[in-house]
């Protein structure tokens, strides 16, 4: 059982960016809005991110970096942080998953898991 002091949940909403995509050049742009909800009992700072991006051909790219969109937000207990970002893929369908490395107010580091989510051009999946 996980410690309730360190409970961070992540939700994702995605959308295809047709105006920034060039299908004839295998360039498909997607935006995603992520909400990081601190359901633990301690404030926690989002230190870094780790993404695993898999395209429709099975090619995998890993991305690691500090914070999110240039920030390392401190999220109070019971509060959330929402941000938007994006990615470009060479296939019409793919998925992303990963984790955020968090630092609780008491000094404990822990991971907040980002469950796999799909990126897809509308109509690409039946």
Curated annotation (Swiss-Prot):
Q: Which domain of life is it from?
A: Bacteria
PROSITE patterns referenced in this protein's UniProt entry, alphabetically: APAG
Q: Which InterPro entries match?
A: ApaG_domain, ApaG_sf, Uncharacterised_ApaG
What positions does the domain ApaG occupy?
A: 2-126
Which processes are annotated in GO (biological process)? error-free translesion synthesis
Gene3D superfamilies of this UniProt entry? ApaG domain
Pfam short name (any one): DUF525
PANTHER family in the record: F-BOX ONLY PROTEIN 3 (PTHR14289), POLYMERASE DELTA-INTERACTING PROTEIN 2 (PTHR14289:SF16)
What's the protein called, per UniProt?
A: Protein ApaG
Tell me which species this is from: Pseudomonas fluorescens (strain ATCC BAA-477 / NRRL B-23932 / Pf-5)
- Gene that specifies this protein: apaG
């Amino acid at each position: 059982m996980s410690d309730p002091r360190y409970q961070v949940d992540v939700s994702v909403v995605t959308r295809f960016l047709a105006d920034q995509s060039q299908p004839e050049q295998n360039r498909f742009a997607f935006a995603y809005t992520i909400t990081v909800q601190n359901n633990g009992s301690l404030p926690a700072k989002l230190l870094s991110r780790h993404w695993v991006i898999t395209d429709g051909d099975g090619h995998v790219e890993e991305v690691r970096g500090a914070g999110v969109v240039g920030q390392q937000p401190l999220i109070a207990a019971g509060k959330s942080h929402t941000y938007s970002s994006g990615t470009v893929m060479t296939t019409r369908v793919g998925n992303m998953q990963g984790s955020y490395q968090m630092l609780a107010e008491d000094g404990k580091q822990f991971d907040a898991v980002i469950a796999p989510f799909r990126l897809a051009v509308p109509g690409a999946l039946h």
